[in-house]
Amino acid sequence: YLICSELRDIDNTKALYSIFLSESGTAIDDVIFWKFEDDLILICNASNTVKIKNHLDANSITYDDLTNETDLIAVQGKNAISIVEEMMPIPDKFFTSKDSIYTYARTGYTGEDGVEVMLDQKDTLDFIQKLEDKDVKPCGLGSRDTLRLEASLPLYGFELTDDISPVEAGLKWTLTNKSDYMGKNVIDEQIDTKSHKYLKRFKINAKQIARTGTICNSGNVSGTVTSGNISPILGHPIGFALFETNPSDNLVEFDIRGNLIEGNL
């Protein structure tokens, strides 16, 4: 009931992306479940750990909290699979596996193929050292942000929030035909009436970056930038903007420090 997906339909060793919804149909957090026979591993955004635990507790869900015992290392990039498979067998995309040390899945949230490895904290530094020995470079959230933007992947806290629903964030595909889930009545109304905000991708053929919070207009439809950055691959600014209604024009103007900069949706 707490998520919009049917957990009972997950096959063994499968990974499932889903969303915890509020009663108002907005996103509490987007998460990934890993299925192992009778066990489910729930991976939420680190910044939302306490919020998710409180939400589970409030709805009488029992669980073992491994937050302070484990680490999660995401190995991403065009060479990720060839490097990691020297240390462990690699599952198919969106599947999971585990051995005596590693529990891992081939999911990724950067647009590149990759593996997420969960392990006891006592084993983390050894694993990181093995990666560094193979010339894998550590990177931070800035690189993750440009990669996921280039792949048009929404990020919690920006395109998914306590005020934005999966429908508005372009994640209607996560909604299943469950007879009921939290916020379903609101979600169904948004789908039926199309009375919701619309998230659109944009590009700017100039150097100015439309950052989060930048006001924009497409025709007579106003919007706000949720994420914006320069794309290292494309060489120009890209991002997401949330509009009050669905724009009919693909031209958009951004108010960047008092200057109107044109772009395309």
Question: Residues of each region from the PLM?
Answer:
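Internal amphipathic helical hairpin motif
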Residues: 1-29, 78-100
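Conserved, structured C-terminal
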Residues: 33-265
